[in-house]
């Protein structure tokens, strides 16, 4: 069976508040593409890093968007969501995120990447990976 015509797949991380996570992504040079208020705060934001995107939405905004029946089916919010981000320079990421909480110190993996993992201010693990050419290449 052929794959569907998928145009984009973007994670939406549900958090209590969006404002605390913005400085984390600002340090990486993310662009705020969409900002939607919910009451006196942000309810939704889409952030872009090059061609990649991540979205954040607040629990309150999700609750307002979904019918109670639908909300009950997805269970309690917020949840932790892990992100894997392939980058061109891990050293650049590490310099920009100096001082942010690290959950995975830099490591070299058997599958050819160097990785360092940080926690965003909402507690979501964000693992940055730089794939290196094989030594014999």
Regions found by a protein language model. Name each.
Residues 1-12, 28-85, 92-119, 130-137:
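Vicinal oxygen chelate
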Residues 17-32:
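Amphipathic alpha-helical segments
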């Amino acid at each position: 069976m052929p794959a569907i015509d998928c145009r984009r797949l973007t994670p939406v991380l549900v958090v209590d508040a969006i404002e605390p996570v913005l400085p984390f992504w600002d340090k990486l040079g993310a662009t705020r593409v969409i900002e939607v208020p919910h009451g006196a705060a942000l309810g939704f934001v889409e952030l872009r890093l090059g061609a990649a995107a991540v979205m954040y939405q607040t629990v309150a905004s999700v609750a307002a968007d979904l019918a109670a029946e639908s909300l009950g089916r997805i269970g309690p919010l917020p949840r932790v969501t892990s992100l894997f981000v392939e980058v061109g320079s891990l050293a650049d990421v590490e310099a920009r995120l100096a001082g942010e909480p690290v959950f995975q110190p830099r490591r070299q993996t058997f599958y050819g990447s160097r990785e360092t993992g940080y926690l965003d201010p909402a507690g979501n693990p964000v693992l940055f990976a730089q794939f290196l050419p094989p030594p014999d290449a």
